[in-house]
C-alpha cells in the first residue's frame, strides 16, 4: 500500500505540471536569453519597443564653429574617432600636455592624408618622441600637420562633444529599453500569477469532485455492505429452513426459489455497484487501478461463493454441513472485503487531506510571490524615478556645456580670423623680402656685358610675378591652392629668367675684341709685305704702293662700320709703317664705350 500512496502523489504532481505553462521567463533586468519567433511575449515586447521612439539629443553647435571644423574634417569617420579614443584622456589633459597635443595632431593629420588618397605618414611609435617623428615629414606634410596642430583645441572639443552626446544617447536608450522590458516582464509575471491562481482553483475543484466521487464510492460500498448483511440474514433464514426441511419439501423449494431470486437481485445490485465503482476508478486514472483490481477480485470471489452457495442449496438435503462450511467461508470473505473497503476509505481520506494541505501551501506560496512582486515593483519605481532625475540633471549639464562650447567657438572664430589676417600679412612681407632679394640677384647677374641688355625685361617680369602673387593671396581662399599657384608663378619666372640669361650669355659677341683681332691680322700682313719689299729687286716700284689705299680697298664696309670712329692712326705708323707687331699691340688703346 505504500507504493500505492506514492503513485497517488505522483499522479497529483503530474496533474499540476500538465496544467501549468511550460515556458519560463527570466526575472532579471538585463536577461540575455531570447525566445523563439512564436513567443507572444517577445513579440509584444518588440511591438512595445517599436511603438516608442528612441531618445536622441542634438548638441547645440554654432554655425561658424561648424564651418571652421568642416574646413579640416571631411567626415567624422572611424579614423577620427580612433585618433581621439587612442589617447584615453580628456581634452583638458591633452591640451595641457604638449607631447600629447602633438601626437593628437599627428593622428588627425594622418587621417586627413589617408582620406585624401595620399600616402600615409611614416610610422611613429608610441614610445618615440614627436620631435624625431616630425623630422621624417616633408614641407607639404609638415604644413598639414601645422594646420591641425593650430586647430587641435577645436577638433578635440568637437570630438569630445560628439562622443559625450553618443554616450548619453546610448545610456538613455538603454535605460528606456530596460524600463520597458521590466514593465513587460511585470505584466508577464502578473499574467502568470493569474494563470497560477486559476490552475490552483481548478485543482481545488478537481479535488472537490474527487471527494464527491469518493463519497459516492463510500455510499455504494455501504449499500453493498447492507446487501451483504441482508444476504447473511437470508442465509440464516435458509439454515433455519433447512432445519425444518423435513417438515415441508414444498416450503423448502419455495425458500430455494426465493433465495435464488434474492441472490440474483444481490448479484445484479453488486454488478451495478461494481460498474459504478469501475467508472469512478476510470476517472481517477492510474491511481485507482489497484482499487479496481481489488473490487474485481472481490466480485469474483463473491460470485464464486454465490455459485457455490447455489450449488450447495441444490444439494442441501445431503450436504448441509458442507453448506454451512461454505457459508462460514463466505462470511470470512465478506469480512476481508469490508476490511479492504475500510482501508480504501481511510486511504482516500488521507489523500484528500494531503491534497488540501498541498493546496494550502500553494496558496501561501502564491501570496508570498505576489507580495514579493509588489515590493519589487515599488523598488523598480523608485529606481526609475532616481534615473529620471539623474537624466534631467545630465541634460541640464549638457545644455550648460553647449552654451560654453558656443562661446568658445565664437572666440576661436575671432582668433582664427586674426590668425588668418596675420598669416596673410606675413606672407605678403615674406613675398616682398623674396622679391627684393630677387632684384638684387638679377642686378648681380646682369652686371656683365653679356647679360646687361636683358636687365629691363627681367625687372618687368619680376613686377608682373609680384602682382600675380599678391592677387592670388588676396582673392584665393584655399591655402593649398594659394601655395600651388605661388610656386607655379615663381617657378615659371625662374625658368624664363634662366632661359633668357643663358641665351644672352651664349649669343653675345664682343665687337671690340673682333676689331682688335682684325687689326692685328692686317698689321701682320703689312709687315710681311714690307719684309718682302725689302728683298725685292724692284725696290722703287714697290715703294710707290699706297698702303693706305690698299687697306681701304681690302676692308669691307662692315669692317669699316665696326671700327672705332674716334680712333686715329698714330703719326709714327704713317711715317714708318714697317714696325714690329709688339709695338702695334702696345700702342693700341682699348677705351670703353
Curated annotation (Swiss-Prot):
Keywords: Cell membrane, Coiled coil, Membrane, Signal, Transmembrane, Transmembrane helix. The chain crosses the membrane at residues 428-448, 458-476, 486-506. It is found in: Cell membrane. Disruption phenotype: Embryo lethal when homozygote. Residues 156-194, 350-387 form a coiled coil. The keyword Oxidoreductase does not apply. Residues 449-457, 507-593 are cytoplasmic. It comes from the Eukaryota. Residues 25-427, 477-485 are extracellular. The extracellular domain (25-427) is sufficient for male and female gametophyte development before double fertilization, but not for early embryogenesis. The cytoplasmic domain (507-593) is necessary for correct early embryogenesis and mediates homodimer formation at the plasma membrane. Has a dual function during gametophyte development and early embryogenesis. Required for correct pollen maturation. This is Protein GAMETE EXPRESSED 1. It comes from Arabidopsis thaliana. The lineage of its organism: Eukaryota, Viridiplantae, Streptophyta, Embryophyta, Tracheophyta. The gene is GEX1.
